[in-house]
Amino acid sequence: MYELKKSKKSKARFFSTTSTYFSYRKHQLFKFYIPKNPSRNNTGKVSMRCKRKKFKNLDLAINYARIEMGRNCLITKLSFWKEKKPYVALVRDSYNSLSYYIAPAGFFVGRTLKTLPTKHDYYKKGGWKFYIRGLGTYVMLRVLRVNDVIFNLLSPSRVLYRLALAAGTYFKILYQSFCKTFYVMTIPSGLIIRVPSEGLAVMGRNSNTQNNKRVLGLAGVNFFNGTNPRVRGVAMNPVDHPNGGRTKTPKPERSPGVE
């Protein structure tokens, strides 16, 4: 008497058995999706480096907070993330789980990174400050001293400071306030900032310190590394380019978008 009519615009899928459903989910999970627009992904970010669909820059989910406590993580792989950014380390902890961390300078495959220490680790081996103040260890700012170098600074509200995130950059501790409520430190630009002492940071500096000395000499290779090649205005003709020609003229500077 009644008929079940399915709309053409409906995206509902019906499965006869449970095994069919899970096989479909497994197929969708490991399926390599290439969008129709080869220059952007589903979130609207530029991920494709070439329209030939040969190169793809993945947006890695990097664990900045390291909320796991008392774990020793083994570095299994070092990867190049983005241009002017530190290397990314794929680590495996004692619970056999994988995660991406920012690799400190001087760390290679096979070394261990320590997460936030537990209460037992603070009083281990007699000298608690000496034990947890190791390179690549995630520590609280209260255990830092003058002239210590840190990176990956987090505020007490678990918010990453948008400072010293480039390759080879770091924070330098100047002194602690008399009331011991904040630390005074410098950023790579030379600016002096104040950070609450309840924050967290990693001992050391960002990796990829020789990034500014790397010269490939080819615009096509730099394009796949995340750098957009720009043509100098001197190399353009002023006939068909508004910003072309020499600058030693009475005419003011103009941008390419201005008619």
UniProtKB/Swiss-Prot annotation:
Residue ranges under compositional bias (Basic and acidic residues)? 250-259
- Cross-referenced SMART domains: Ribosomal_L2_C
Q: Name one GO cellular component term.
A: ribonucleoprotein complex
Q: Where in the cell is it found?
A: Mitochondrion
Biological process (GO) annotations held by this record are: translation
Keyword presence, Cell division: no
Q: Which GO terms describe its molecular function?
A: structural constituent of ribosome
Q: Which Gene3D superfamilies match?
A: Nucleic acid-binding proteins, Ribosomal protein L2, domain 3
Q: Where is this region: Disordered?
A: 234-259
Record bears the keyword Signal = no
Q: Which UniProt keywords apply?
A: Mitochondrion, Ribonucleoprotein, Ribosomal protein
Family, as annotated: Belongs to the universal ribosomal protein uL2 family.
Question: What is the name of the protein in this document?
Answer: Large ribosomal subunit protein uL2m
Q: Specify the species.
A: Paramecium tetraurelia
Q: What is the lineage of its organism?
A: Eukaryota, Sar, Alveolata, Ciliophora, Intramacronucleata
